[in-house]
Curated annotation (Swiss-Prot):
Membrane topology type: Peripheral membrane protein
Enzyme Commission number(s) of this protein: 7.2.2.7
Protein name as annotated: Fe(3+) ions import ATP-binding protein FbpC
Family annotation (InterPro entries): AAA+_ATPase (IPR003593), ABC_SmlMolc_Importer (IPR050093), ABC_transporter-like_ATP-bd (IPR003439), ABC_transporter-like_CS (IPR017871), ABC_transpr_FbpC (IPR015853), FbpC_C (IPR041230), FbpC_RD (IPR055223), P-loop_NTPase (IPR027417)
Positions of the ABC transporter domain: 5-239
Record keywords, A-Z: ATP-binding, Cell inner membrane, Cell membrane, Ion transport, Iron, Iron transport, Membrane, Nucleotide-binding, Translocase, Transport
RNA-binding in keyword set: no
Reaction(s) catalysed (UniProt annotation): Fe(3+)(out) + ATP + H2O = Fe(3+)(in) + ADP + phosphate + H(+)
Amino acid sequence: MTAALHIGHLSKSFQNTPVLNDISLSLDPGEILFIIGASGCGKTTLLRCLAGFEQPDSGEISLSGKTIFSKNTNLPVRERRLGYLVQEGVLFPHLTVYRNIAYGLGNGKGRTAQERQRIEAMLELTGISELAGRYPHELSGGQQQRVALARALAPDPELILLDEPFSALDEQLRRQIREDMIAALRANGKSAVFVSHDREEALQYADRIAVMKQGRILQTASPHELYRQPADLDAALFIGEGIVFPAALNADGTADCRLGRLPVQSGAPAGTRGTLLIRPEQFSLHPHSAPAASIHAVVLKTTPKARHTEISLRAGQTVLTLNLPSAPTLSDGISAVLHLDGPALFFPGNTL
């Protein structure tokens, strides 16, 4: 199967400062990939290189087997068959919704029967048929993003690129528009690359996630694999919360840390030193005895919150603060037992 997108050893610098460093990845037809990372990691620059707005220093890019960038090739933006959607849609204020979408077909008119049929199909797909005669200033932010998506899909591009398209919307609207937009992409069978800083968004909607740091891809994997089997400590902490401790491996599949001896997930040899990471949801709290892999603690303070209970406790010389979705009623100062559900992650060489 030919990849919808293939990037090979792509690099880009600005004023001798590397921004993209040997980026390689592929995208299957119909697949939705999220690229996540801290601000300045290079994710938007990567998207702009794919679209043709920036020229890489080296590497290759191909769409459905056709080279659009290499040492000897650099197709202009209009010939790349890509849709590009940014934070605020960037609609033409003097054109109606209908004509904004028609502009995606190249002439802004939508006069032929085939063009009208395509525009009407995109209006229906994105749920904005009743808005066809309105102007951008008459639309909400969410409606404008729907129009921008319809315009991007109108010419039937090989790939859709989306640069944090929901970040300017409020939380409730963002959730609805995000779900509708993902559904529209899947209904149209389109491959898409999202740039996002929202890891929860990526975990929920991506087929695969690429984690970037300082111009490099740390790991590309399914949401489940990335969360459960991160390649390194940086990827683990970016994709989810974690409580970390220096630790040393034992021969029996455990590691010694400040909380005691705990089971770990690692193939490193005994004696290896590194960092142990526990996901917060792995902890459960019991007022009395609990199964193996338990930690004796003293409750310092419990604070009920809207969706969880915040519990501060001391285990040995270590003070922990946990947000537990449900917890037994515990008085401050009472002894309790923390149970660890499943092995902790262990990363050799990552010492704190």
